[in-house]
Regions:
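Conserved beta/loop motifs at nucleotide-recognition and modification sites
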Residues: 1-161
Length: 161
């Protein structure tokens, strides 16, 4: 739906949740409103890059609580690393934020955030992470791993570096 429809839906949920009370708290909103999944994914990659395994796992469990399928989370995580790989490759070629945004199909602000995040990784690391993500996806499809375990393994392994 549209943003206004989403806002209206979220407001309705908050009103129903706090029905018996006169005031709505931030905790009420946090308890019922859908958080932006892409923000969680970006924060997870940040936590992984910083070696903060617990924070990355906490964010993953929050996404699961929001009924986000594990395979979608894995796809989005690998996609974020792919974006970082592309952004870092362009930056290494001497391109600036605006050119990177244009070439990578990103908003300039988003390109800037990705450029900062990409600095925390080496090109080889990013390539390896993408390959490992693809392998885990294959392991789930062939029944070697459950989807949930695959994502947990991905987060744990990447945050140990």
């Amino acid at each position: 739906g549209t943003d206004m429809e989403n806002i209206q839906g979220e407001l309705e949920k908050v009103f129903c949740y706090a029905l018996e009370r006169d005031t709505i708290t931030k905790e009420d909103i946090d308890a019922v409103c859908v958080t932006q999944i892409t923000n969680h994914i970006f924060e997870m990659v940040d936590a992984v890059a910083a070696g903060n395994q617990q924070k990355a796992l906490d964010l993953y469990y929050e996404l699961l609580a929001l009924k986000e399928p594990p395979m979608r989370i894995l796809f989005l995580l690998v996609r974020q690393y792919r974006i970082l790989f592309h952004v870092k490759a362009l930056a290494n070629q001497g391109y600036g934020r605006k050119e990177i945004a244009s070439k990578a199909g990103l908003h300039p602000f988003v390109a800037g955030k990705n450029m900062e995040q990409a600095k925390r990784f080496k090109m080889g690391q990013l390539r390896r992470v993408m390959e490992e993500g693809a392998q885990l996806e294959q392991d789930v499809k062939t029944g070697l791993l459950t989807d949930n375990l695959a994502v947990e393994l991905f987060i744990v392994k990447q945050s140990e570096r």
